[in-house]
Amino acid sequence: MGVGGSFWDLLKPYARHEGAGYLRGRRVAVDLSFWVVSHSAAIRARSPHARLPHLRTLFFRTLSLFSKMGAFPVFVVDGQPSPLKSQVRAARFFRGSGMDLAALPSTEAEASADALVQPRNAKFTRYVEDCVELLEYLGMPVLRAKGEGEALCAQLNNQGHVDACITSDSDAFLFGAKTVIKVLRSNCKEPFECYNMADIESGLGLKRKQMVAMALLVGSDHDLHGVPGFGPETALRFVQLFDEDNVLAKLYEIGKGVYPFIGVSAPNIDDLPSPSTKSLPRARSPHCSHCGHPGNKKNHIKDGCNFCLVDSLENCVEKPAGFICECPSCDKARDLKVQRRNENWQIKVCKRIAAETNFPNEEIINLYLNDDNLDNENGVPLLTWNKPDMEILVDFLSFKQNWEPAYIRQRMLPMLSTIYLREMASSQSKSFLLYDQYKFHSIQRIKIRYGHPYYLVKWKRVTRSMISNDPPSKQTELEGKNDKVEVLDGDDEVVDEEEEEPTMISETTELLDEPDVPQVLDDDKDCFLLTDEDIELVNAAFPDEAQRFQEEQRLKEAKSIARKSKLNVAGFETPKGPRPSGVQLSIKEFYRSKKGLSGDSGKDGSRKSSDVDLSKNLPKSVRRRLLFD
């Protein structure tokens, strides 16, 4: 949730819509609890009996984020919850249990007293530890927070350890985040929303401490109620009256009953007059009821109006509907009216704030402004991404998810190929892919997946003798049941030559997060793999092969352009002999054009009659036949 009162809707106009390539090469901090709760709930809604959806979601999302999007994820685990968040936790428990929310503690003090020693849900904690174990086998860095996970994500982003945060909690900005990705869909053509603090500052004029002040007024996870009568718009208007450096100090003054604005003689809010008892603006000078300008109607009829005589020849022109006088007297009266209206509004909201006890809550302010959220006294460690431990990973997922080892190895191939290409780009290693079994062969073509271009890379197996030496699980890890696969140039589909009927997918849960299964080309001599790889990464890892492919593409485009130009020229020329069989004929050679027969004009400018007399009395079908005879 984060900040209450639809705070995301207030920020939505300043969101940037980025594509899948935005995260390539960037470090991103992922709020692990957000993935475990939100995506697991979505899978259970589709398949209530899904087996450990939190592990399945994390596995495929991590593979997609690392290999398809090219990001470097850093996962953050929640620590002990703050007692200030007890009301939100209780409300979630009540909603999940179907209980009446009216039984919730009415005050923050009651909720905090009951929640001081309450740990997190044991089942949820077990789920998180399973996810941490899986991430360690995948080689991903995992950091533990003292309290809220989004607080540590924001700290990593603010200190430059990561480039963005992936979380749905809007209070990440209050913890210091600079870039927040709210929702990330890997297999979707639609761009995702990315919020930059710089855009919010330029659009709304809000900085970190001003957002903290808004959370105190509107409410948040640490104070559900906030100040009565404050919504996002009212809170925004109020905090914009102060600078970031003194906005919290002004809230302290108002909480103590001191009016913070100048121009009012009463220093205490209780001594301020109510809006209804304040004096009205001074009456303006008399104006003509006919034209609306300064003066009166009698004098204008007799001597004329100085303003009307400038714009017209009449002495006094009747004022139009919605007329607004722009004389100095009226401008001053309007300004005074707006000033009094703003003063009345300021007094009203200040009285609402002063009526709250223990406002502002200093614990909430310190929680948001704290920059020490890592559960490690030595500070943020060096972030490294290691190679996955395949043997332990296969055993873990086989036990937890009941997956076949071949299925696991197939899904891991995009991640392994990405790691291999990164190593080749950085050090030009002489090793091969998949335990030195496959080497880079060629680039087949450019492939568009979800609006992003990729290289379709062909990997060749080094020796066929290695297949017989592999264990059964590794021997079939990529070949599967079908040996003959045809790669189509036009579509991103794999077609089995022996089986034409569509096969049913046995996986009952949502498949949108799964990466593409590698394609296998197997013949009597060689075995090949086809994978989708990032274009820039392949160019850096194998520059010679990439340059050769680009030259071939340019030659193909040049030949295609030359062939099309020849066809266009041949279509306008009159054939003098038999045409080649490969040249498409013009449709005008088969059907006579009526426009060509009647296009010439006589000397008198009249058009010649057509060779075929199309009588209006003939049926339409007969006239059509006569036209082409």
Curated annotation (Swiss-Prot):
Residues 594-617 are annotated as: Disordered. SUPFAM superfamilies: 5' to 3' exonuclease, C-terminal subdomain, PIN domain-like. Mg(2+) 2 binds at D169, D171, D221. The gene is RAD. Binds 2 magnesium ions per subunit. They probably participate in the reaction catalyzed by the enzyme. May bind an additional third magnesium ion after substrate binding. Signal peptide: none annotated. This is Flap endonuclease GEN-like 1. Its EC number is 3.1.-.-. Residues 601-614 have a biased composition (Basic and acidic residues). It comes from the Eukaryota. Belongs to the XPG/RAD2 endonuclease family. GEN subfamily. GO terms for biological process: DNA repair; pollen development. One of its GO terms (molecular function) is double-stranded DNA binding. Mg(2+) 1 binds at D31, D78, E148, E150. Its cofactor is Mg(2+). Gene3D superfamilies: 5' to 3' exonuclease, C-terminal subdomain (1.10.150.20), 5'-nuclease (3.40.50.1010). Residues 2-98 are annotated as: XPG-N domain. Residues 1-87 are annotated as: N-domain. Residues 136-225 are annotated as: I-domain. The lineage of its organism: Eukaryota, Viridiplantae, Streptophyta, Embryophyta, Tracheophyta. Its main location: nucleus. Endonuclease which cleaves flap structures at the junction between single-stranded DNA and double-stranded DNA. Possesses both single-stranded and double-stranded DNA-binding activities. Involved in early microspore development, but does not alter meiosis or tapetal cells development. Possesses Holliday junction (HJ) resolvase activity in vitro. Cleaves HJ at symmetrically related sites of the branch point. It is an enzyme of class 3 (hydrolase). Monomer. Interacts with PCNA. PCNA stimulates the nuclease activity without altering cleavage specificity. GO terms for cellular component: nucleus. Keywords: DNA damage, DNA repair, Endonuclease, Hydrolase, Magnesium, Metal-binding, Nuclease, Nucleus. Highly expressed in anthers. Expressed in roots and leaves. Residues 136-221 are annotated as: XPG-I domain.
